[in-house]
Amino acid sequence: MEVDMQRITIDPITRLEGHGKIEIFLDADGNVANTYFQIPELRGFEQFCVGRPVEEMPVLTGRICGVCPEAHHMAAAKACDAVYHVDPPRTAKKLRELLYSAFYVTDHTTHFYALGGPDFVMGPDAPVAERNILGVIHKVGLEIGGKVIQARKAGHTVIEMIGGRKVHPCTSIPGGLSKGITREQRDEIEKLGRWAVEFAQFSLKLFGDLVLGNPAYV
């Protein structure tokens, strides 16, 4: 981090996937006048898509990210629906929604415990050397660290059942999905979902205690 009398530069940002920097400009009184979030890298995915069949977009655009490919996969699938003027059947909509809910489990777990946790859980006054995932696990306990891994595994298991792969799903097509799920998979998804809800409720309470209950943040 670089600091002068009128500008603070944080480069690189370490609490997200990818590269970025923040520049904060101060006025004469030292108050924030403007803040800019910048992504200095060029990905070029828009150019990859030019000239390709529209049906390839849900698979191709998912490669934008290895942490949130489901978001890009689903956005492209819904764009394909619009291109073809089709409304997916109710079952396909429910399965897509279920896949996205599983993505919520993995993504929110990652962000709260691994990316945001080093700051939110450890607190702004914690030593820099302790503001990492190991520091978070030390504070919340090894048992909770195991549940974090279990939550990500549960989400990825459901994503694989519906999306075809644990990372970079490939089953959404214009008008629906290219595959369904079996009765056994449905029962397993229900079991994993109930466990994930319990873990989410625990995580919300932890957030309330450690973050909302910290006067430095609220």
Predicted regions and their residues:
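Active-site bordering "gate/hinge" segments
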Residues: 1-218
